Curated annotation (Swiss-Prot):
Originating organism: Ovis aries
Gene behind this protein: ZFP36
Protein's recorded name: mRNA decay activator protein ZFP36
Keywords associated with the record: Cytoplasm, Developmental protein, DNA-binding, Exosome, Metal-binding, mRNA transport, Nucleus, Phosphoprotein, Repeat, Ribonucleoprotein, Transport, Ubl conjugation, Zinc, Zinc-finger
Chain spans, region Interaction with CNOT1: 311-325
Region (Necessary for RNA-binding): 95-171
């Protein structure tokens, strides 16, 4: 028996003895082949030649089996189960948040070719059976699109929330919109008008009102500057005038009763309408662009036979506007 065989047997029994041979040892001793060995002349690791200077040794590199022994003085770690290393495809995953527009539009690819590469995961509807109604704002498609009517195009296209075509008007018939188009916006008149009051309200005691879009509601009868009883007189009886003596501004105090109040026939149209034109809509648009709300217009035909219009006179509201400006 030669000395080399004896030395190998002793080395296997005593791992603490250093190895003086130049041959590669496949021992599991910490001194010769462990990753925590302090010897710098260890040539048993194949990755020692490829190790760069200053590069730290990773615990998950250099072993084909994927397991690295712990450092000296520490118990070996229990191997992790394979289910943690590679999760199974049947494991539950986080469900993505569904969009508010999910299945609210038809899939173009499915409509053209009859198939879709995403299948059941497609965010669009495959047929009318999967099509859903999106949750819309209560005023969706109830107002005109200013960009479409002023510029002739809209960057939002079919997804715009405003009306591009008359067929898109989704307003309920018989119910006027609460929020209407403002006439003072770029001079664009609105095509819709508020429905007239019921016939039961058009009596001699309640005056008939004419509104334009974005106008304020009529004031209560108690707030009217002229009592409704003045309109219930006989057609030939002259209307009694009273001195209002308003105390709101100096110009109103200087105004005489004749310059403030005229006959009933003169109230058929506001005095400023003569300076604006003969079209009532033109007067309504100018009034809304000036003050934001329109002044009421009395209709003389309700209270008796029409009378010839008197000379144009200014109402107190226009005196206040001229003073404030």
């Amino acid at each position: 028996m030669d000395l080399a065989a004896i030395y190998k047997s002793l080395l296997s029994l005593s791992p603490e003895l250093p190895s003086d041979l130049g041959e590669t040892e496949s021992s599991t001793s910490w001194a010769s082949s462990g990753p925590w060995s302090l010897s710098s002349s260890d040539s048993s690791l194949p990755e020692a030649a490829a190790r760069l200077p200053g590069r730290s040794t990773s615990l998950v590199e250099g072993r084909s089996c994927g397991w690295v022994p712990p450092p000296p003085g520490f118990a070996p770690l229990a191997p992790r189960p394979s289910s943690e290393l590679s999760p199974s495809p049947t494991s539950p995953t986080a469900t993505p948040t569904t969009s508010s527009r999910y299945k609210t539009e038809l899939c173009r690819t499915f409509s053209e070719s009859g198939r879709c590469r995403y299948g059941a995961k497609c965010q669009f509807a495959h047929g009318l059976g999967e099509l859903r109604q999106p949750s819309r704002h209560p005023k969706y498609k109830t107002e005109l699109c200013h960009k479409f009517y002023l510029q002739g195009r809209c960057p939002y296209g079919s997804r715009c929330h405003f009306i591009h075509n008359p067929s898109e008007d989704l307003a309920a018939p018989g119910h006027p919109h609460v929020l209407r188009q403002s006439i003072s916006f770029s001079g664009l008149p609105s095509g819709r008008r508020t429905s007239p009051p019921p016939a039961s309200l058009a009596g001699p005691s309640v005056p008939s009102w004419s509104f334009s879009p974005s106008s304020s509601p009529p004031p209560p009868p108690g707030d009217l500057p002229l009592s409704p009883s003045a309109f219930s007189a006989a057609p030939g009886t002259p209307v009694s005038r009273r001195d209002p003596t308003p105390a709101c501004c100096p110009s109103c105090r200087r105004a005489t009763p004749n310059s403030v109040w005229g006959p009933v026939g003169g109230l058929a149209r506001s005095p400023s309408a003569h300076s604006l034109g003969s079209d009532p809509d033109e007067y309504a648009s100018s009034g809304s662009s000036l003050g934001g709300s329109d002044s009421p217009v009395f209709e003389a035909g309700v209270f008796g036979p029409p009378q010839p219009p008197a000379a144009p006179r200014r109402l107190p509201i226009f005196n206040r506007i001229s003073v404030s400006e």
